[in-house]
């Protein structure tokens, strides 16, 4: 799987004509979100809702809300970014990359390492709190923030969140009976689809790396590598406090280390239209995403 990403990354940097049609990439992302959400719901149906699930949700939400404050402080100290741009970037690093999460889940499964199925719900819960804390940081700096219905619509009804949570609920309601009916769809093709999707993400990340020159400083590049490490450490601390299994701890670390490039950019376009989106996307998709997939 990771080699598929590396292939796409190399092809993009080498300026190969290799490409994946946008419609195909969209379909693969929809499939992966549905499959991982459904399987997580089935796991919860067999496990039941208990204190561990609620504690994991609370820990994930706390991480998502607090990590932007650390990211904001590091960005202001190590880069020349304005408070507005630093807060926008910080929101990306408090939220999560669902693709990184799906990849980590697949890697654990391939190695026979079990993890808590409800971590899918934790992932969905960690999308929005970072946006709220980033907007608070901007408001504190005196800049204008748009907190209107359109913003909350972007935060709460983002397509990836709706599909992930919806599939999770379907899996939780139907349980093993539902899995028996569609296992040929959500289980067997998963690894192959993920490989093709990671190939496309490698192509996208390569384009981000090519465009990084002139957009971000050396300090920002260092931040893009250091911040996920600090996030992973924070995620491990929360996992140990909660008492997650080794697989669950690895997923919590993955969530805390990743950076959003889907849900948060859409919200930032509404809430902080003056912020420079190329900085956030170059860091999250061009630096942190390939670092997490190849090294992390």
Residue spans for each PLM region:
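N-terminal signal-anchor module of multipass membrane proteins
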Residues: 1-45
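Alpha-helical transmembrane segments of multi-pass small-molecule/ion transporters
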Residues: 1-10, 22, 49-206, 213-217, ...
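Membrane-interfacial loop-to-transmembrane alpha-helix junctions, especially the N-terminal start
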Residues: 25-28, 216, 220
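Solvent-exposed, amphipathic alpha-helical segments
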Residues: 43, 205-208
